[in-house]
């Protein structure tokens, strides 16, 4: 738990003053905060093999430290052999301490383990939120490579209270996300 406390303390002691100075906020309440991290795995192949959902739930729960839930389809699509309410993905939403703990492990341990890693893209969604696509779940040290039956990717979305992309980018950069270039393109 000391890592979590240190990341929160770093936010209060270093990141808030840096962003206040950079953007000229009059109050510390204007400084953007990281609200939640949503990890999602879309598993279209789960229509053919039902065990993939259970495997993905256990792996995502191991990675995040929180129970993952299956997401279900909203409607029938006959071309994909998909029925309404059939499980087709897995997701977990992290907030508070678990969010900071996961962010710390992602930045310090998991991202550097990606082969030929040169940084992540710096494109945000227009509202200060950022989604990172990961190709393989094996970059996380919690996953035992010997027990992997299928390589599964995931989307990691960082939801911030930032009003603009520049504010969101600055916040995530201060948290240590390794963007490809020093300034936003």
From Swiss-Prot:
Membrane-crossing residue ranges in chain numbering: none
Organism domain of life: Bacteria
Gene Ontology molecular function: any one: structural constituent of ribosome
GO CC terms, sorted: ribonucleoprotein complex; ribosome
Gene Ontology annotations of biological process type: translation
Listed InterPro entries: Ribosomal_uL5 (IPR002132), Ribosomal_uL5_bac-type (IPR020930), Ribosomal_uL5_C (IPR031309), Ribosomal_uL5_dom_sf (IPR022803), Ribosomal_uL5_N (IPR031310)
Keyword Transmembrane among record annotations: no
Gene3D superfamilies with a match to the protein in the record: 3.30.1440.10
Alphabetical UniProt keywords: Ribonucleoprotein, Ribosomal protein, RNA-binding, rRNA-binding, tRNA-binding
Family to which the UniProt record says this protein belongs: Belongs to the universal ribosomal protein uL5 family.
Assembly and interaction partners: Part of the 50S ribosomal subunit; part of the 5S rRNA/L5/L18/L25 subcomplex. Contacts the 5S rRNA and the P site tRNA. Forms a bridge to the 30S subunit in the 70S ribosome.
Reported function: This is one of the proteins that bind and probably mediate the attachment of the 5S RNA into the large ribosomal subunit, where it forms part of the central protuberance. In the 70S ribosome it contacts protein S13 of the 30S subunit (bridge B1b), connecting the 2 subunits; this bridge is implicated in subunit movement. Contacts the P site tRNA; the 5S rRNA and some of its associated proteins might help stabilize positioning of ribosome-bound tRNAs.
PANTHER family: 60S RIBOSOMAL PROTEIN L11-RELATED
HAMAP family recorded: Ribosomal_uL5_B
Protein name, UniProt field: Large ribosomal subunit protein uL5
Native species: Parabacteroides distasonis (strain ATCC 8503 / DSM 20701 / CIP 104284 / JCM 5825 / NCTC 11152)
Name of the encoding gene: rplE
